[in-house]
């Protein structure tokens, strides 16, 4: 019971922060699971990805009902992402824990930079059409699928800016496409992690409802709080956490 309560709180906090600044909860959930529950880095990545697939379904349904989605674009991204997500999960499994921690730290710093640049992304719209747009979407799936499987995150942090900048897709539609595309891709990555023994299933009972509630609360609060201040504070926290991970010492 105590473990379920702790995992619920971790999911809740991850969802709130993710909802506040428009990020998936994985970048918060993984450090919390490693720090509070003393989880192995590999298991934290696998468990996070499983939980995020469930919350991605809810988000995709919401965006679909609002009409902010492009099913064809989602299919194109998922077509390549389902293959690379499996490769990413296997690559993470093959890495020593200290190397995976360093890689995750670098990813957190990269995410923080994207977070700070977020207000300016919608003003740099690309104009790819036809075959070029298809190639952009397929290529986006290749990179974000691998990243999702390796880092245990949804991949939208990178996927959405890529679609906005390179394919000329609107911000809200890009977010909906990202959520829908990562259901099959994230599912493949999550299943691969589970097969490799990198999923702590008993934590999911608390994590999944916690993220659901937290994302809803975070999204609601986001409209009441100044966006710029939230992004800067969260980016600072991510950079600090990222540098701590990057400085993980190699075993002697």
What annotation goes with each model-predicted range?
Residues 23, 41-43, 49-52, 108:
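Acidic (E/D-rich), amphipathic helical modules within compact regulatory domains
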Residues 45, 172-179:
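Small-residue hotspots at the loop-to-helix junctions and early N-terminal turns
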Residues 51, 76-77, 177, 181, ...:
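Transmembrane alpha-helical segments of major facilitator superfamily
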Residues 1-15, 35-36, 41, 61-150, ...:
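Juxtamembrane transmembrane-helix boundary motif
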Residues 50-58, 183-187, 213-214:
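Membrane-embedded alpha-helical segments of transport systems
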């Amino acid at each position: 019971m105590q473990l379920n309560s702790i995992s619920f709180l971790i999911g809740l906090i991850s969802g709130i922060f993710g909802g506040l600044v428009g990020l998936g909860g994985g970048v918060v959930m993984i450090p919390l699971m490693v720090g509070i529950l003393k989880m192995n880095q590999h298991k934290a990545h696998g468990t996070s990805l499983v939980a995020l697939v469930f919350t991605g379904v809810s988000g995709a349904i919401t965006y679909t009902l609002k009409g902010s989605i492009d099913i064809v674009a989602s299919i194109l991204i998922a077509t390549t992402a389902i293959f690379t997500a499996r490769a990413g999960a296997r690559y993470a499994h093959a890495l020593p824990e200290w190397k995976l921690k360093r890689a995750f730290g670098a990813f957190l710093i990269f995410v923080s930079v994207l977070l700070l640049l977020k207000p300016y992304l919608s003003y740099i719209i690309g104009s790819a059409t036809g075959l070029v747009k298809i190639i952009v979407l397929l290529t986006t799936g290749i990179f974000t699928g691998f990243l999702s499987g390796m880092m245990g995150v949804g991949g939208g942090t990178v996927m959405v800016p890529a679609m906005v900048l390179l394919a000329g897709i609107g911000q809200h539609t890009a977010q909906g496409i990202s959520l829908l595309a990562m259901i099959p891709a994230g599912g493949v990555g999550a299943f691969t992690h589970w097969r490799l023994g990198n999923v702590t299933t008993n934590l999911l009972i608390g994590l999944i409802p916690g993220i659901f509630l937290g994302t809803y609360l975070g999204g609601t609060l986001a409209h009441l709080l100044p966006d710029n201040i939230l992004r800067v504070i969260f980016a600072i926290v991510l950079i600090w956490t990222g540098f701590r991970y990057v400085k993980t010492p190699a075993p002697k």
